[in-house]
């Protein structure tokens, strides 16, 4: 859930439709009259995750698109609220994106993306940290990962960390996840 101008919204990332196709509409609902009302559908491709965040008073929705058809190398989408609805702000290249997490360090907004695997369906890939730079997100850092399934950031004793969970290395599921310290 997120709030825009004292209105409560909720967004859902939809993975596939009743025909099991992953070119689907993910949905945004607004609280009105004691219940949520659908206000917008947004094109996504096997959306696995959605996060809302703000930059300088502007509200954004980011969707982690897992796959388009049989292709795991597909863009994920960042939408921006225009005062009435969400418009596509930017497409970012991802590889089987399973999760994303916006975070702020020293006033700079970043978006971490956990990539599961690319079109070769190999678990070794790179997850990406994007940085908001002017009117777009740019790649700040690529992190080697194996089937990354989630990503988050947290602060501890004045330091910022990025945690990336790993689902599998392609041979076993008892794997090590990674913790990175911001330098």
Question: What feature does the model see in each segment?
Answer:
Residues 1-6, 51-57, 101-107, 152-158:
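Structural signature of eukaryotic scaffold interfaces centered on beta-propeller domains
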Residues 15-20, 66-71, 116-121, 167-172:
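Short glycine/acidic-enriched loop and turn motifs that connect beta-strands
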Residues 24-31, 75-81, 126-132, 177-183:
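Beta-propeller blade signature
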Residues 32-38, 84-88, 134-139:
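Beta-strand initiation motifs
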Residues 41-51, 91-101, 142-152:
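Repeat-based blade/solenoid architectures
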Residues 97-116, 120-123, 127:
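Loop/turn-rich, solvent-exposed surfaces of beta-rich toroidal or solenoidal domains
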Residues 126, 145, 149-183:
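Blade-level signature of beta-propeller repeat domains, shared across WD40, Kelch, NHL, RCC1
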């Amino acid at each position: 859930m997120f709030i825009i101008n004292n209105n409560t919204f909720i967004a859902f990332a939809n993975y596939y439709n009743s025909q099991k196709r992953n070119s689907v509409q993910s949905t945004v609902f607004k609280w009105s009259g004691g219940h949520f009302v659908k206000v917008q559908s947004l094109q996504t491709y096997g959306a696995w995750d959605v996060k809302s965040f703000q930059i300088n008073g502007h509200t954004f929705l980011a969707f982690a698109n897992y796959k388009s058809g049989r292709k795991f190398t597909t863009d994920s989408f960042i939408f921006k609220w225009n005062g009435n609805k969400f418009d596509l702000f930017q497409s970012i290249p991802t590889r089987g994106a399973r999760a994303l997490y916006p975070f702020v360090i020293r006033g700079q907004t970043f978006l971490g993306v956990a990539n599961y695997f690319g079109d070769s369906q190999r678990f070794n890939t790179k997850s990406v940290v994007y940085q908001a730079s002017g009117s777009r997100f740019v790649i700040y850092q690529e992190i080697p990962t194996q089937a990354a399934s989630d990503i988050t950031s947290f602060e501890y004793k004045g330091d910022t960390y990025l945690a990336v969970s790993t689902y599998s290395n392609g041979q076993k599921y008892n794997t090590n996840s990674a913790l990175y310290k911001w330098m």
